[in-house]
Amino acid sequence: MTRRFLLLCRHCLLAGVILAALPARVAHAATAATVPLIPLPAQLDVERGSFNVDAHTSIVVADHAASTQRTARYLAELIASTRGLHLPVRQGAATASSIVLLRDPHAPVVNREGYALDVAPQGIRITARDDAGLFYGAVTLWQLLTPDAQRGAVQLPAMHIRDQPRFAWRGLMLDSARHFQSVAEIEQLLNQMAQHKLNVFHWHLTDDQGWRIQIKRYPELTRLGAWRRPPNAGHDGEPQRYGGFYTQDDIRRVVAYAAARHITVVPEIDMPGHAQAVVAAYPQFGVTGRRPPVSVDWGVNPYLYNVDDATFRFITDVLDEVMALFPSKYIHVGGDEAVKDQWQASLAVQAKMRALGLKDEDALQGWLIDRVGRYLDAHGRRLIGWDEILDGGVPADATVMSWRGTKGAIRAAQQGHDVVLSPAPDLYLDQLQSDRAGETAGRMPVRDLASVYSFEPVPKELDAAQAQHVLGAQANAWTEHMPTMQHVEHAAFPRLAALSEVDWSPAASRDWGNFTRRLPAQFARYRTQGIAYADSAFAADIALDRNAALASGTAQVSLSNQAGSGVLHYTLDGSVPGRDSPEYHAPLTVKLPATVRAVTLGADGSMLAAPRQRVLSRAELLSVSGNEMPNCPGSDFRLRVQPLPDAASLAPVYSVNLFNTCQSYPSTPMDGIATIRVDAVRLERNYALAHEAKLVVSHPHATPFGELVVHQDRCDGPVLASIPLPDPARSARNFTLQATLPAQRGEHALCLLYTAPTDGPLYALDRAALLPEGVAP
């Protein structure tokens, strides 16, 4: 009797599957919990019976295609490295206890990336009509064989999988311009993309902060344009210069490595904006003729390409070498955030506009993009660009990547253009995954795992015909705040697991609870392969009414996690919690002082996140991290940043609002409070805000370097203290400020506001503590 599980249904649990008792050394790949697959297949049927994969199992290549041999070897190597099973690969007919791989023009799934996977008591068979489908079938089998972190044999239930992707474009963009990654690091990322069935690697290779691709006709692009001098260079761990580039041999290696995993590499050469590194190398291709340094400022810099014929020859020369290296049909030309000030100020550019009969600078950008698009068309390629390319008119066959929300995708699809959904902040991996104090550097607001999983690539505003233009969705790893690959991996995983299901699986099969129950197996795979994934979704949040605890000496403590999944266990004595610790069911009454530690465990007792801790004492409750303080009302551009932008370490991070250096200390009983102590930090102000610079609030200051001003309740409330900031040239980066506060009664919030000049360093709060009378600062 067959139990059928169509993954077009909302619930895809292998409930009720009956497996024979197994020896202790053999793991179950599917139990009554969930099938350990991400992304979820389009259709899965489970039957009675099982097949045991062990050291006696062989992988059989049943056709004569070299590509099938490569997939078989890939599967064998993956199983060996993650499961410890060394399965021989041979060519020929299937035998008992074998895994058969076969390219078959009559395979049941027609889609070129689709496959059929059948597990029977006699063996396993993967068939597909194309190499890509066979590869993805092998990836699915590998996931079935790695349901946990154990080594050795695995027993699979008999099953039939018929699978194919929902979308053709399943992408990840990596920014190698702001921070540089080695070829080996990129190869590790490509490995993970393949295991998540992602098939487009969008490689951001040029920007204001660095040119990363060798162009032999223009050697200054990498001799000068690939390197920048960081703020505070040579001090406090900041390098004297930062940069790097990929030789053409490096590029070929990455492209070949990706192709072997059925990933297309789409290069991005940004134009006409984000061009400061180009102009630093070849100022004649800029507008002003002046040579700027390669930028150290994150954001929107003013440098644009010129629009004369010499500059266009430079662009086409570069594209010729790019096309020779990248076989991708698509070439990404950027087109975003091109601030037109230099064009507006240039007499030559304005004369060019008049000669072309163009009404404005947006139309001039449209003219440039159209000219580049026609050049790419003539060479058998297709232009793709960010959604700003719509503003000045766009080539008829151009593809639009929508990043300013989904409006660009809607507009483009309604005009008949193919689109890729890549909206900020929804699919921007530099957005923080939680607002916990210990989260790494990145941008606010939070975009957690659940928000990525809930993203729908087809906007509801499109009709059925227009929806056919949606190629898929892509996540973007912008690396301003990711100086190391560890930062990138923390930002990308497991959010890419969520995206893979958005891009691959049928929309109707999406089920958050089911997805979270499949994540423990994926986390085990990450750990086995050394991936520094984020555990933010399962990290325990320890919450309480702070003021009630301060007043009564007893706290009502609530535990939760983002995922709403797993089992929470806790201790109250500071010891490490585990499955033998009390299980959380309802708020806890905890007498101060105490140390609450909590952890989320999976159904099998595995730890889904590292334990989190909160010390409950009067002193700790009166001490608040700057990362936990909200911004003051008004203009808001909130980041968490490291003190040094290019330091290659997981340094502490600090919350800043680029528009207004002001934060709110929460309302607190102020009776008996005598002193405020602030641990402060001085940061680099390396941000290019372009026209948004007018939003930066400048506060009057009474001393040369500004003050930290403490207001009662609101930022226009009574001044309780004003503490001068030290001379940045003669003080440490981290320093402490303190002041006596006037006597107050009742509960009050505090506004903590820096008045430092906006042309100098940026300041942040590490921690602010209130000290009662009689407590030494």
Feature names for model-found ranges:
Residues 30-169, 487, 503-525, 529:
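Contiguous, structured surface segment used for ligand recognition
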Residues 108-312, 316, 321-330, 371, ...:
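Feature activates predominantly on carbohydrate-active enzymes
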